[in-house]
């Protein structure tokens, strides 16, 4: 009986193994600590009364200050590397601000320099319209117009158009460059009148436009066609010399080159040459170039397709009156701009 009781007591002291698995132990709760301050430029600035720029991690629990120079593990402070990081952030921010300021200053300087060359970009449409109307009505019935018409009657119209328009395009670019150079020199050496800067280039351009406007209207009001006949006779003489040389009509390239030289010489110092200089000095050169090229292209195309038919649809006097009126109108606009400025 005693043996049975002892065995029972020994069995009851043994651990009982259950079939179910035991849940994992709950980890101990870590006390909540204060959030690290952000590494912004403002947080890097030293506070009043602080001697060292060291960012520490605060604890919810009160206690003695934690030693510096320890790691993240046991609630320890960040090393002094944060001070150098803040210094780099400040230096980077200052560098970015200085770079932006220098770029803006450089862009402003380059824009002012380009504006002296290309003029006011907002005045392109006005310069285009003025140059187109002025060149178109100036070239109708001009010596260059008759030269293109006479050459097209004896050669291919496309070849004559290329040679004529090429010469007029080069002449236009030269005129605009001269006008813009005069405007640039006037900006460097200003002329003072009454205590204010007086735009000499715009004034001379207006005077030149007035001169051509008055002479064109006087030729139209004279009642005879001597001026137009003189232009046509000069064109016929130039074309006869061109054809008499025999240089040229051998190939398309030689014909284009000969036409280019003939028109370039005839156009040099012409009324449209000086009027383009005047417009470029007072208006946007980009608009003047585009408008002049468009006006030359349309007038040359009319001359090549059938310049002799122009008189059946449009009177020579009407063309002269329109051209002279445009010269005076553009001169008046230039003078008004001078007064307003």
From Swiss-Prot:
CC terms in the record's Gene Ontology section: chloroplast membrane; chloroplast thylakoid membrane; Golgi apparatus
Transit peptide extent on chain: 1-57
A Pfam family annotated for this UniProt entry: GDT1
Disulfide bond entries: none
Region spans: Disordered: 1-41, 54-76
PANTHER family registered for this protein in UniProt: PROTEIN PAM71, CHLOROPLASTIC (PTHR12608:SF6), TRANSMEMBRANE PROTEIN HTP-1 RELATED (PTHR12608)
Name of the featured protein: GDT1-like protein 1, chloroplastic
Native species: Oryza sativa subsp. japonica (Rice)
Lineage, broadest ranks: Eukaryota, Viridiplantae, Streptophyta, Embryophyta, Tracheophyta
């Amino acid at each position: 009986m005693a043996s049975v009781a002892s065995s029972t007591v020994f069995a009851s002291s043994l651990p009982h193994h259950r079939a179910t698995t035991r849940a994992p132990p709950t980890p101990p709760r870590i006390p909540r600590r204060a959030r690290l301050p952000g590494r912004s430029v403002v947080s890097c600035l030293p506070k009043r009364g602080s001697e060292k720029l060291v960012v520490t991690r605060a604890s919810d629990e009160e206690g003695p200050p934690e030693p510096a120079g320890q790691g993240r593990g046991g609630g320890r402070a960040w090393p002094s590397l944060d001070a150098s990081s803040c210094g780099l952030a400040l230096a980077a921010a200052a560098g970015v601000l200085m770079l932006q300021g220098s770029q803006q200053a450089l862009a402003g300087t380059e824009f002012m320099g380009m504006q002296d060359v290309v003029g006011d970009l907002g005045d392109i449409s006005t310069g285009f319209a003025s140059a187109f109307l002025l060149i178109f009505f100036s070239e109708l019935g001009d010596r260059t117009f008759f030269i293109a018409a006479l050459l097209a009657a004896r050669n291919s119209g496309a070849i004559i158009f290329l040679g004529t328009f090429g010469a007029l395009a080069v002449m236009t670019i030269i005129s605009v460059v001269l006008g813009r150079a005069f405007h640039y020199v006037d900006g460097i050496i200003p002329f003072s009148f009454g205590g204010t800067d007086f735009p000499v280039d715009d004034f001379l351009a207006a005077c030149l436009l007035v001169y051509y406007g008055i002479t064109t209207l006087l030729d139209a009001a004279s009642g005879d066609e001597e001026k137009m006949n003189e232009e046509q006779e000069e064109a016929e003489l130039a074309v006869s010399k061109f054809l008499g040389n025999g240089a040229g009509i051998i190939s398309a390239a030689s014909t284009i080159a000969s036409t280019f030289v003939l028109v370039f010489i005839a156009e040099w110092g012409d009324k449209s040459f000086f009027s383009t200089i005047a417009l470029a000095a007072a208006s946007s050169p980009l608009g003047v170039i585009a408008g002049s090229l468009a006006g030359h292209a349309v007038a040359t195309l009319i001359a090549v397709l059938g310049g002799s038919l122009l008189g059946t649809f449009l009177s020579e006097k009407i063309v002269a009156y329109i051209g002279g009126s445009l010269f005076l109108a553009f001169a008046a606009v230039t003078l008004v701009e001078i007064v307003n400025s």
